[in-house]
Amino acid sequence: MDSGTEEYELNGGLPPGTPGSPDASPARWGWRHGPINVNHYASKKSAAESMLDIALLMANASQLKAVVEQGPSFAFYVPLVVLISISLVLQIGVGVLLIFLVKYDLNNPAKHAKLDFLNNLATGLVFIIVVVNIFITAFGVQKPLMDMAPQQ
């Protein structure tokens, strides 16, 4: 090993000319060497969360349809309808909350406390949605057996 007098800073920049330093390697697609636009990053993150929220919303709507098709004779009819309804309402609330989070300017320090609260609220609501959906899965939603029986 070379025991030269060069100093390297942990997680710091590489000296010019060193392989991997910004001036030695060309910029790759998707990589930038400037600061990150925080508003753009937050908007992308909220858009991704919204898409996942929509997917879960569609899955819960499908589960609600299956439970309603089975009717009140299904053993867990009432608990599942209540849990799925709670999940749907919370998901709509989180979706609206994410829209508000995207609209705020993250560069304004006066709004940081409010944004932090709203972000923590959204995270807490998502956690509650996950727990509710675990219970929905535990009770089980099956398609009606009438659809599987041959018609004569």
UniProtKB/Swiss-Prot annotation:
| Result for mutant: residue 123 to L | Strongly reduced ability to homooligomerize and mediate plasma membrane rupture (cytolysis)
- Organism of derivation: Homo sapiens
Result for mutant: residue 93 to L: Reduced ability to mediate plasma membrane rupture
Q: What is the effect of changing residue 111 to E?
A: Strongly reduced ability to mediate plasma membrane rupture
Q: What is this protein called?
A: Ninjurin-1
InterPro entries tied to this protein: Ninjurin (IPR007007)
The record's comment on protein family reads: Belongs to the ninjurin family.
Q: Which residue stretches belong to region Disordered?
A: 1-26
Name the consequence of residue 125 to W. Answer: Strongly reduced ability to mediate plasma membrane rupture
